[in-house]
Curated annotation (Swiss-Prot):
It is found in: Nucleus. May be involved in the early patterning of the most anterior region of the main embryonic body axis. Pfam families: Homeodomain. One of its GO terms (molecular function) is DNA-binding transcription repressor activity, RNA polymerase II-specific. This is Homeobox protein ANF-1. CDD domains: homeodomain. The keyword DNA-binding applies. SUPFAM superfamilies: Homeodomain-like. One of its GO terms (biological process) is regulation of transcription by RNA polymerase II. InterPro entries: HD, Hesx1, Homeobox_CS, Homeodomain-like_sf. Residues 119-178 bind DNA. Belongs to the ANF homeobox family. GO terms for cellular component: nucleus. It comes from Gallus gallus.
Length: 196
């Protein structure tokens, strides 16, 4: 309302206001960083969706001739989003799923390879005899030197680093059990003092 009274009082102000509003209405340029352009939802003048910039996909799509290796690009114009989806699109998706499905043994082998890649080795299963010998040595010395560990490795047919890890784990187990026994002792003393 204030602008109408201002425009009525000053004709040049109303003319300037019309120029500015006309400029804003006529301005149709869109920013390249708009939400629509980032999401790839921009429409060209003919109504077709603008292809989003995905150079990592473009290289794969052009180099691979096998249609099973091509990953379908999902867009809102895709018929899979509509109730009347065509069979060809469904067939492509099924082929893609079939190609990427793997058996249980393949998954396990891949998991082993992946864990190897991360630096993890398979777990060592110690025999009863090996554990008995290691426990006897641990009772005498919980921190054996390299010479004792190498001798044990030769006798038990194990790698020296496995023996070193066994002793580290055994010391951690002893420390944990010691802590738990102290906790139980304190707990028992506390409960008995409460009962008295």
């Amino acid at each position: 309302m204030a602008s109408t009274s201002l425009c009525a009082a000053n004709p040049s102000a109303s003319q300037n206001l019309r120029k500015v509003s006309g400029f804003v209405e006529n301005k149709t340029t869109q920013c390249s960083f708009s939400i629509e352009s980032i999401l790839g939802l921009e429409q060209k003048k003919d109504g077709a969706a603008v292809k989003p910039h995905r150079p990592w996909m473009d290289g794969c799509m052009h180099q691979l001739g096998d249609p099973h290796l091509q990953i379908p690009v999902v867009s809102y114009e895709n018929s899979l989003f509509h109730a009347n989806s065509n069979l060809m699109q469904e067939e492509k998706v099924l082929n893609c799923e079939k190609y990427f499905s793997v058996t249980v043994t393949e998954r396990l082998s891949f998991k082993r390879e992946l864990s190897w890649y991360r630096g993890r080795r398979p777990r060592t299963a110690f025999t009863r005899n090996q554990i008995e010998v290691l426990e006897n040595v641990f009772k005498m010395n919980s921190y054996p030197g390299i010479d004792i560990r190498e001798e044990l490795a030769r006798k038990l047919d194990l790698e020296e680093d496995r023996i070193q890890i066994w002793f580290q784990n055994r010391r951690a187990k002893l420390k944990r059990s010691h802590r738990e026994s102290q906790f139980l002792m304190v707990k028992n003393n506390f409960t008995s003092s409460l009962l008295e």
